């Protein structure tokens, strides 16, 4: 690894503040913790902490008591299809949705066993499962959740529920800041399919943005950042993300990341996927890195982009790729 003039954490924060980084940031400059005392991390098979969590113990109820089942073929969980949905109509939420008592979770124990887990030279974060739309889906199924976003008759009930969910997320984040002193909340909410968004930008602005903005405002007021994990072909929803106060978005590769960088990179940091899978050659991966770097070079002081390097080729040298990107861009921002 080449010598760096500042820590990877400091460089990442420069990017998020739209200050000039010293080299092009990469996702490997970050690290995250998802401890097992949070029910959703077990339910969603996403425990990341000092001690590995046994795969046979994943699944089960999330923080709202919704049961999840682990599906080995997709390496992830889904709501238990044999259990009826909690809500048939969003107006039922006050009687049926039971919010978690987070003070009953063992925060002190989780902090103690993970005391040395986080690499403080990197940017630290935790994931929050699930975001507004995904949580609504877990309560009432996809079709009813989608209808709730556009049904004028339930608008007041929907906003009341989403406001309560925002309160819940803020309390979650407050405790993670207190016990783990993390830099960022990684908010998990998918808004689209491979071809298009699930809803319009108008719906996103009216129904989701006000509540996301409360969460991002809390993060910013408490020295944190707000990252949105949002899958799908959702280029049209970028204005809503910006209005929600999102600092960076790690979207999927079917989106034109370079085009979005050109259009919105002065207001949100866009993550460009750098995939090195079994079918990619080293030459292809390095050539893409070169193309992206040369594209951002002329506007590097005004707009922000980072690489999401996904190395899934057993013969690939991931660290050599990262050193190549650092050496090629170190000094580029001077």
Predicted regions mapped to residue ranges:
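Active-site loop segments of alpha/beta catalytic cores
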Residues: 1-31, 98-334
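Short, basic/low-complexity N-terminal boundary segments at the transition from targeting/disordered tails
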Residues: 26-48
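Short active-site-adjacent helix-start/loop capping segments
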Residues: 34-37, 78, 135
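Short acidic, Pro/Gly- and aromatic-enriched capping/linker segments at domain boundaries
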Residues: 44-61
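A gly/proline- and charged-residue-enriched helix-loop-helix capping module
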Residues: 74-116
